[in-house]
Structure formats: C-alpha cells, structure tokens
Amino acid sequence: MDGLIERIDTTGLTPAAVGNRRTHVVIIGAGFGGLTAAMHLKQAEGDVTVIDRRNHHLFQPLLYQVATAALSPADIAAPVRGILARQANANVILGEVTGIDVTGRAVLLAERRVSYDQLVIATGARESYFGHDEWAAVTSGLKTIEDATTMRRRILLAFERAEDSDDPEERRRLLTFVIIGGGPTGVELAGALAELARAALARDFRRIDPTTAASS
C-alpha cells in the first residue's frame, strides 16, 4: 500500500490538468484498501473523495459470526463518513460507479461526473465458484451483510424445518451444511456452525438433537 501511496502525486500531470488548484484523488471503494489509501493521504496537499455504493465500511473477516448469529450486523459495520469525519481533506459520496471516462479523467455515477487527477480502484473481489457458476443458484456468498443475514436465516430455518420433520433422512439432509472453500472464512464458518449447534441451540429443540448437525 505504501508503494501505491507514493505514486499518488502530481508526477506526470500536465499544468492544464492541475493548474492552480489542489490535486484531486478519487478512490472507488470504502473497504480496507480504499480507506487505508484515503487515510494515508490525510496530510497530502490535495483533496480525497471516496465513492462507495454503501454508506458503511464492513469488517469482512467477522461476517461468519453474523452468519452464525454470534454478532449482529451493527457490530461489524461502521459509517464511512464517521471514519473519515476528522480528515479535513476527505469527502464521501454515496453512489454506484457506472463507468470511467479515462480520456476525460472522470468517474461516472448515475447522475453526475466526478473529475479526478489520480484514481484508485479498490472495489474488492467477488466469490469464485471454481468454474461451477451453477453453484451460485443454490448457495450464498459471504461478502456483504446481506449475504451474512441471508445465510443466518437459511441456517436457522434448516434447524426449524428439521424439528418439524418426521423423516430421519430429511432431518439428516437439513442438518448437513456444505461449505465451499477451505480458507480462513470457510474454516471459521465450520467452527462457528459447530459452536452454534452444540452450545447456542443445544437445548432449544424438543424433537431433534442440534449437536448432530454436520458441516463439510
């Protein structure tokens, strides 16, 4: 990141591009990368604009805890404006980027253009289904609060449906959770599911034993 920040200056800009005004750095994305870039520019001789389609910064490493009902969404989200409130040279725009006019040096939103001298694109990454895009229709990613609350609803609903079922095979199916991906998020989610089943839900049901739930 420090190497990136070093390149955000007026080097290579023509006098017409800067003139007598302050350099304007536009950052698309208010995730870890975008906010780190913005805060590194706190003392810079220029103005910073952060654009994001959501008004909050999300601590994604703890999304699995929201998905398993250990935390609420508010516990892992903070207002972007609040984070940058004391940074005098920073401005925040809530909006979705529809395009970039490279020649005209402008970021395009639905109803406005935001001119820039330097542009940082920090929009993050999407889920990978390892070449099996059909999985997207039957599963949920874990990148946003909406993803986490959807997953939480599905998990808790599976226990409820298992409680209502008289079919042992149906119960087994409902209490089996498949996790695609064995990285930190996948491993932590599997552990949190086990904790949910064996501790939080262990005594909540009459007809099923939540501790028999399995993840793979």
Regions of interest found by a model, annotated:
Residues 2-93, 98, 177-178, 184-216:
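Beta1-alpha1 glycine-rich phosphate/pyrophosphate-binding loop at the start
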Residues 2-23, 90-178, 196-201:
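FAD-binding core/adjacent interface of flavoenzyme oxidoreductases
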